């Protein structure tokens, strides 16, 4: 940022171990921001502003600077959510000096279901109408989909005093899940969101259930967008069905001249989808029905082999099951892969509700 840093906010956090939390901030944000570490301090720089965090007497002093009031609220929320996540249930006090009350999130968009259709036997697409699709055009592609209880007027969340999202409770409780904006139709002012259908005994899938039953006129909301697309001339993309909408969006947004290798694991050939792209795109489909976990040819083996054969300058993007993501992240670390040229995320965990 430059001289446009006109909106400022300060806060103080009292974690159980301030040194450890500062280390976690540096470790986590290196894949998402420009991280400048110094003795007892870190400066985070991103498109929405800067966060200057200093260690003072076992507390963290936070100074935010952003170009608009909206991005200031977003930055405050981002820092607050991460600090409580890093605390992992341990005591944490976080307060902000002269923070304004936010009754409704600045990046919350109420949308209306237009249609729902099956793309493949296990992937269902919901199209929603949005008054302003401008924020969704460009590099930020992930949103929280908010599904209100049926039969009640939606009560959308705001920001609490500590900067975290204040979710409605009781009868107004909302289901929230993270999804990818698969495509934006600017002229129609519509957004596409693909939902993986994966029924399993004893596993709740509220997001998938919503898509299965979605009706035109139904109201939901989106928080975002966030999660920028990788920018590189050469990309390695890897994931399963849960990551397929994101892989498809990355391929669609990639510029002509870029080279992309994609490894995608799906149930069988009926789950393969066309992936339009202006880039040079090579897709290797893996079929779960014909692969054996832990044997040569499995998803993890294919991804690690592809990483080992990366050309210099390749950005590696992987999204998959939690334990697989951890193994692939460890493999990248072992090979000394540049943290700024990778993004490895887990989208679901075996045996737990994720959709």
Model region roles, listed by residue range:
Residues 1-355:
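Extended, composition-driven regions rather than compact fold-specific motifs
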